[in-house]
Amino acid sequence: MAEDEFVRRLGEVGHWQDNGRVGILDLLADAGLLVHEGLVLTRRAHEEFLRTSGVLRDVRTAARRGEDARRQAAQIRSRHASYPVEGALNRAICEALIGLNARVVVVLSEDLEKGSLRSVPEVKDAVRDAWLSLRGLERQVEAAARGEDLPTWPLLVYSQAKI
């Protein structure tokens, strides 16, 4: 599996309607407008996180139970809240951060914005938190219960420049 599937430069991701704020910023960067330099952790990266962390298995199990999706999502979040990002995804994130060469970064998703991140462990924790958002997990449990593919979403990591 190629680690470059996990990370793209802002402006190189492609424009999907359901990419939310990340998709809008990517579109602006692709159009040549001035936006912060950044990198996008792709939907493929999110899929890898779900698979390697065990979240995918837990979401499917929760969907089969047919209980309240919000409660199930909270339980899944609690079980995986300290899961370390590992393997190929970890390497891809570390290499991308080195390439970004920013002292302070922000992680942005549809449900989360965490700034003032100064270390690789802080960034990886924010990535995990974004992919374990309660709202996102609830949507995944509901989709699995309907027999649909689990929704995934990209994350933007960009330099937090002082203006």
Q: Where would I find each of the regions flagged by the language model?
A:
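N-terminal beta-alpha lobe that positions the nucleotide/phosphoryl donor
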Residues: 1-162
